[in-house]
């Protein structure tokens, strides 16, 4: 496993995930009966400051259909958490107008690259174009100087 699991921290994430899903109207418990489901949800809500007990609640009451989705969410959150510790792995955000993002996404798709790789490639293309333009300008000046001397 690449990223260390931190039980207390991840239990808090699981609690937040389940509460968010409940507030969005999803069934987070395995119970069909509304009163049993509400009782289990109330128990979960009371565990906000008891991260160790959240895992027990999950084993006992959670809807089995949520298991894989929650695992994926926690795995992604763990990755972001550890990547945020280092400057070179931390995700950055930039504000783009929708049309710019749309064009960039289309270009990335056509090139078969990620958005980041496409941006780097565009920067390199612009730098190479600039170097080429400078070189051509220099050659033109040298040629004019040679022709002017004769």
Swiss-Prot record:
Cellular component GO terms, alphabetical: cytoplasm
Keyword Cytoplasm set for record: yes
Protein keywords: Cell cycle, Cell division, Cytoplasm, DNA-binding
Cell compartments where the protein resides: Cytoplasm
GO molecular function: sequence-specific DNA binding
Gene3D superfamilies in UniProt: MatP, N-terminal domain, Met repressor-like
Disulfide bonds: none
Pfam families xref list: MatP (PF06303), MatP_C (PF17414)
Gene Ontology BP, a term: cell division
Lineage: superkingdom: Bacteria
Keyword DNA-binding: yes
NCBIfam families, per the entry: PRK05097.1
Quaternary context: Homodimer.
HAMAP family: MatP (MF_01073)
Family under the similarity heading: Belongs to the MatP family.
Functional note: Required for spatial organization of the terminus region of the chromosome (Ter macrodomain) during the cell cycle. Prevents early segregation of duplicated Ter macrodomains during cell division. Binds specifically to matS, which is a 13 bp signature motif repeated within the Ter macrodomain.
Protein name per the record: Macrodomain Ter protein
Natural source organism: Escherichia coli O6:K15:H31 (strain 536 / UPEC)
Gene name in the database record: matP
